[in-house]
Amino acid sequence: IPATIPATIPATIPSPYIDLSDAYSPRLRDLARRMEGGVSAEGVYAGFAGPQFETPAEVEMARRLGADLVGMSLVWETIAARHLGAEVLAISLVTNRAAGTAPGRIDPAEVSRAGNEAAGRLADLLQRLLDQV
């Protein structure tokens, strides 16, 4: 996957018609749910191109369409991986409230800090998942 991923399917994927009916593996999702300290919730992820945070209007649009979470990654990588036939599990680490859902501005330093604080727990979970696969 290129370093910059556009909001459309990259032209390097031979077919734009990739079946995403089961984008995320039911088997791996079940495994992640059963792990101690694992996945605490499942939901609908809305992917935006980034690299900027979403606007309050984009967050509200995604909410109205049924999204529980918004972010700048995951979707494009999933499409590419499914195109290659990979079994995919997605785990999102929520590091901030979406724009417009809490007072104040999103602080990129705080987002990085929250990610760094959770890195060890996330690495442990991923290692335990990989040990089970």
Q: Each predicted region: which residue ranges?
A:
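Glycine-rich phosphate- or other oxyanion-binding loops that anchor nucleotides, phosphorylated ligands
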Residues: 1-95, 102, 108-133
